[in-house]
């Protein structure tokens, strides 16, 4: 079948979780990450993801994932990424992008800025809109990794609920979507 592609594959953690029945390809800029993938027998390419995608034929990939990558892209690069995903995915193909959730004030104000290569936070509503605008279907936002409940306020009031949502809510989110059928 068609390959599953992981952009920003790191040391291959996600590639190793994908079914071996599929061809799995990791793309990463970091040579040490690519070497770590090779040492595990994983196929990985050291290349800019946009360049790699541009070299692929239309409708040639089953799914594209990118965990904690899109926050490193300019708006123009994110647009190009979505355009290339739309082009190379086979009909019904899937994208999965995970990124820090700026709805969580702690994540947005502190954790996001611990990585100087993060360009800007991407609110879930914006990402959902852009993915839909680019023609993807079945677009869903999945809020992930809430701060442990023991850190939340210990009272039942509207103020506590709102504070919990803003400070202790999901630290990340994923957007999933499918390319339409022909």
Question: Could you describe each region identified by the protein language model?
Answer:
Residues 79-91:
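A short glycine-rich, Lys/Arg-flanked "PGG" loop and its adjoining helix->strand segment in the class I
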Residues 2-8:
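Conserved class I S-adenosyl-L-methionine
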Residues 68-72:
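Short catalytic micro-motifs in class I SAM-dependent methyltransferases
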Residues 119-135:
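Short alpha-helix
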Residues 65:
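A conserved beta-strand element that flanks and buttresses the S-adenosyl-L-methionine
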Residues 11-52:
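Class I SAM-dependent methyltransferase SAM/SAH-binding core
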Residues 97-118:
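Short, glycine-/aromatic-enriched active-site segment of Class I SAM-dependent methyltransferases
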Residues 129, 139-182:
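A C-terminal cap/extension of S-adenosyl-L-methionine-dependent methyltransferases
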